[in-house]
Amino acid sequence: FKNLDLVIIDEEQRFGVLQRTRLLEKAPQANALVVSATPIPRTLALTAYGDLDVTVIDEMPPGRGRHSTTCVPEEARDNLLRNIGRMVASGAQGFYICPAVEKGEAGLMDVTTARGLVRRHLGSRRVEILTGRTPSAERCRIVDDFRLGRIGLIVATTVIEVGMDIPAATLLVVDQAERFGLSQLHQMRGRVARAGAESVSYLVVSESAGEHASDRLKVLESTFDGFEIAEKDLMFRGPGDVVGIRQHGLPDLRFARLPEDTDLMLAARDEAFGRVLGDDDSAEWQLWVETVRGLTQGEVIVV
């Protein structure tokens, strides 16, 4: 792109490091704007290192109603389904999210099995399945019927995570929620918190989920703030390689940890900017430059 001046990457959390890098390499001098309701941990870590400047919009869009999130143990699923049946019978609409499309995927709840479970409690209300494999024409028909109130519940995969704007939807159930990242779950919650009515999300947690997974999901019970969720995700997953391509896990920092040492990182960032912008060519600074180059020698540098 000879005249590319601005690259905007929306829903940034859905792209891999190398995908973003290839795009930016087409015009190295272009300005880049990355947008996300929930920054992934690596992105949050880069803000502390100075690669990204951050603008935080900490207000909800006007007209949004209250939203609550509740974690539900797997053994209470039947009671939850009865409650959902009453809600949908009263006119509520919503989504039931599963981690698998087909049966037999490592014991995961699939959309066909889930539809059978919820149908027992929804009476005459219509239930449809929506996945990435659903033909385009059928997908449009389902979404249109849902928007018109003809469908009570859509059983789906994460295909509804973005781009689904149905203001009347007020109910979300995520089965085996421990299988999803906090970013995904927060994005899915946004599908049912788009109008003035109160909305609710239920996160069904498997018996096999460990204490770590349960603690992670409880973050969503306490906040609807995307940036706070990203910071918690950073603590649970780690920021990934700040100079590499891994997007989660513990970074190879020698003397600090994120986010615990954020203040130290910001101080180092300010010092580095001061040196670079001041065109420092002192022997001390050159020694630091060579030291950093030595630490990253042989690594894939994509930042």
Where in the sequence are the language-model features?
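SF2 helicase catalytic motif II
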Residues: 1-35
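Structural recognition of the conserved hydrophobic beta-strand(s) that form the central parallel beta-sheet
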Residues: 8, 31-37, 46-47, 97, ...
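Conserved interdomain linker/interface between the two RecA-like ATPase lobes of SF2 helicase motors
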Residues: 51-115
